Structure formats: C-alpha cells, structure tokens
C-alpha cells in the first residue's frame, strides 16, 4: 500500500528517489553529497531506497570537451559511456561516509516491457534491497536509441516505482513545485496538492536553460500520474529541498495515489 498523504512520507518504508541531470552535474555536482545525506538518513531509519539518477551524458560532456549536449546519438552514447562510470564513482565516494554500498542497474524501456526481462529486473532489485544496498538506476544510454531522450528518466522512475511497489516516488529537479503559470511571473501560485484523476491544464515547472536534461512539466506530470495510478504517492520538488521532502514537510506538489 502506497503512502496515501504527505503525513505518511516520514514513515514510508520503500522509496524511489529520482534526480535529474541539471541537479547533479556541471556546477551542481556538489549537490550529490547533500542528496546522499538525505538518502542515508532514511536508510538509517530502516527504509529501503532506490535512486534513479540521470546525468550520465551531462557528466561525460566535459571529458569529451563538449560545452553543449550533443545532438547526434553516437556522441550522446559516447558521453554516456564515460559519464556513467564517473557518476557512479561520485555517488559511491559520498556513500562511503555512511558505509552504504551502491549497486548499478542500467535499464532500457524494453527491459521493463518484456515480462521475462521485467521479472529479472524485479528479482535483482528485490535482492539488492534485501541486502540493504542502494540500487542506482539509470537508462542504459550507451545502447538506447529513442529512449535516450525518454523524459529525462521521469517515466523510468515511475516504472521502477511500480516494479518495486514503492510507497513513495520523490521526483527531484531544480525547481520546487508545479505552478499555475511560469513561477517568475506575477500571480503564479504553487500547486500544493493534485487529487487522483484531477485535471491539470497549463501548469508550469519553470525553466532552467541548462541544456543538459530532457525532462519538463509534461514528463513529470505524466510520470507522477503513472505511479499514482499504481497506488504510489508522488512528491515533486527541488533537489535542494530533499531533506524537507523526505521529512514530510509541506514542500513541493503532492500527487495523491489511487485508492
């Protein structure tokens, strides 16, 4: 049974945390440590956590001397091949402070579409969690084709939440919530709560202009609905507010689950 309301976040037993490229790469690479701090805190209270992390391409770009996200697939794949290993190293280096070991899980959309592949992924994930390890999931950008632009892993995070029957899906980006209009405009209001099945027209999640990720309001709302439909509560907020979010404080936009 998923987390039915914000009040249950602080006691959620199985949590999927998704973080976007722009939040943990480039000038924001320093946010990995506080993100790990927050994950370690809920891990210490006994919760099981899966981290879905974008950022392989963005992390690999400087090593290929690229200033902007490459447009061609082959260079994206090359950047991902380099960046994924660096990204996992950075996470593990930070996790070492808490004695937590990460397990890398690279998936494509096809892995979760085919029943036998999905069962294999589920079995591996359950075993990692049972061993008190931290699965770090990313799309396998080095071999993916059109999936490489697949909503900056928002949909993948929702599918992983369904796969492991998570209580909570925490979608992190570099803006704090959904808004009724662009948040920098006068009169913009934060949308605090979205009831299951509620219509959302014209919502905004802000713009970062970083050019390193592919997600936006549409992909995040679609992912939130996908997870909520399966009974998982969803909170959308900024990476900077991850501690407050996991403590159940009143931040971000809450998507109530079915039931």
UniProtKB/Swiss-Prot annotation:
Highest taxon of source: Bacteria
Metabolic or biological pathway, per its Swiss-Prot or TrEMBL entry: Amino-acid biosynthesis; L-proline biosynthesis; L-glutamate 5-semialdehyde from L-glutamate: step 1/2
Disulfide bonds, paired cysteine numbers: none
SUPFAM superfamilies: Carbamate kinase-like
Binding of ATP, residues: 18, 173-174
Main subcellular location of this protein, as a coarse class: cytoplasm
A Pfam family assignment: AA_kinase
Keywords linked to the UniProt accession: Amino-acid biosynthesis, ATP-binding, Cytoplasm, Kinase, Nucleotide-binding, Proline biosynthesis, Transferase
Subcellular location: Cytoplasm
InterPro entries: AceGlu_kinase-like_sf, Asp/Glu/Uridylate_kinase, Glu/AcGlu_kinase, Glu_5kinase, Glu_5kinase/COase_Synthase
Keyword Cell membrane carried by entry: no
Record EC number: 2.7.2.11
GO cellular component: cytosol
Catalytic activity: L-glutamate + ATP = L-glutamyl 5-phosphate + ADP
Enzyme class name: transferase
Family per similarity comment: Belongs to the glutamate 5-kinase family.
Protein name per the record: Glutamate 5-kinase
Gene responsible for this protein: proB
């Amino acid at each position: 049974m998923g987390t039915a309301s914000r009040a249950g976040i602080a006691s959620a037993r199985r949590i999927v945390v998704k973080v976007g490229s722009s939040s943990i790469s480039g000038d924001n690479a320093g946010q990995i440590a506080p993100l790990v701090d927050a994950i370690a805190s809920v891990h210490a209270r006994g919760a099981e956590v899966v981290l879905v992390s974008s950022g392989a391409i963005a992390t690999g770009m400087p090593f290929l001397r690229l200033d902007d996200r490459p447009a061609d697939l082959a260079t994206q794949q090359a950047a991902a091949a380099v960046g994924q290993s660096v990204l996992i190293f950075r996470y593990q280096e930070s996790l070492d402070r808490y004695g937590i070991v990460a397990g890398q899980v690279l998936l494509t959309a096809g892995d979760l579409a085919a029943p036998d592949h999905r069962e294999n992924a589920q079995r591996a994930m359950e075993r990692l969690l049972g061993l008190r390890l931290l699965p770090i999931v990313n799309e396998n950008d080095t071999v993916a084709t059109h999936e490489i632009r697949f909503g900056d892993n928002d949909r993948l995070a929702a599918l992983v939440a369904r796969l492991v029957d998570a209580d909570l899906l925490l979608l992190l980006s570099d803006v704090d919530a959904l808004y009724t209009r662009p948040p920098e405009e006068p009169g913009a209001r934060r949308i605090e709560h979205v009831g299951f099945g509620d219509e959302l027209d014209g919502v905004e999640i802000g713009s970062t202009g970083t050019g390193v990720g592919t997600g936006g309001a549409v992909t995040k709302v679609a992912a939130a609905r996908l997870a909520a439909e399966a009974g998982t509560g969803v909170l959308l907020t900024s990476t900077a507010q991850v501690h407050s979010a996991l403590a159940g404080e009143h931040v971000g936009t809450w998507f109530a689950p079915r039931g």
